[in-house]
């Protein structure tokens, strides 16, 4: 068996250019680190596989470096989101809404990692993923697909994709599973989430369905809400197909407010994660069809590594953005001046 080149072999023949030497050293360190990681996974595959298949959080921590190139800085909200998503995988939750501030890795967690873990659990799983942003839809779908192709994922779950369906908008596994990724306002036809087989077989994921610029539009906002009835529900293979909606709040009558108030008829488990946790906060009376999840997080900043109390005080200077996107309690247009230019657009994470 041919041995790997030594560091001295790698540097042999180089000029004395310091930049060239440093570049080669960095490449060598990266190569060795990757080889060591691959060896760790191969030698501990059974333990890693069992741990990851039992916990969305463990799966995310294990796979995140192979997606982002660095480890995940876990915050309290990650554990809360993962616990809720684990209930979806276990078949214990059929309707889930998660409200969380922008920039808190919601798309990576409930999008990329949820999709990849779903295919790890069942290569025949079928997902529909939708968001207001076509760019985000393609990026999330592509990231999930690319993560599944990594040597690290393949060493644990050797899932194969059909070569004739490897586009970012739609792709399939050789086993018959697949993903359709489409904008919330676009066409979603020819594909249904989940199969009729027992166990976890996929889900419908709706990630930020409403564009921030359209939050105050009495035309666009109701149109997106109506698509719950006209488009999304018709793409479910049966009524018990799991649905995960993860979004920042933008308006009292955005899709979260619309569904939690009973407009869709379904009851929803609701994980509400404001940027500042206040255990004395009362669940909104108008959410007649919401079942609040007790996340058990301690009072204070939701993710101190991202927003300290001082940072949050600065966010509060704009009450419209803060109340909606950060506090998850948007102000009613009739209660204050509400202008769409107050809202900040986030296309990722």
What are these regions (language model features)?
Residues 169-231:
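Conserved RecA-like ASCE ATPase "motif II neighborhood" in helicase/translocase motors
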Residues 110-122:
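Walker A/P-loop NTP-binding motif
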Residues 93-113:
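Walker A/P-loop
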Residues 108-111, 138-142, 253-260:
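A short acidic (Asp/Glu
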Residues 283-349:
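ATPase catalytic-site recognition across NTP-hydrolyzing enzymes
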Residues 1-94:
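N-terminal accessory segments
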Residues 130-187:
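Conserved nucleotide-state-sensing and coupling region of NTP-binding domains
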Residues 216-292:
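ASCE P-loop NTPase helicase motor core
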